[in-house]
Amino acid sequence: KRGFLDVIKHVGKAALSVVSHLINEGEH
């Protein structure tokens, strides 16, 4: 199950990066 949690963390970080990118694109 630890591997599963690692996947969740990885996906979460990726999602955060995408959201931040979209927000930055929207502001400019």
Swiss-Prot record:
Signal peptide: none annotated. Expressed by the skin glands. GO terms for cellular component: extracellular region. The modification Glutamic acid 1-amide is found at residue 25. It is found in: Secreted. GO terms for biological process: defense response. The keyword Secreted applies. Belongs to the frog skin active peptide (FSAP) family. Cruzioseptin subfamily. Has antimicrobial activity. This is Cruzioseptin-4.
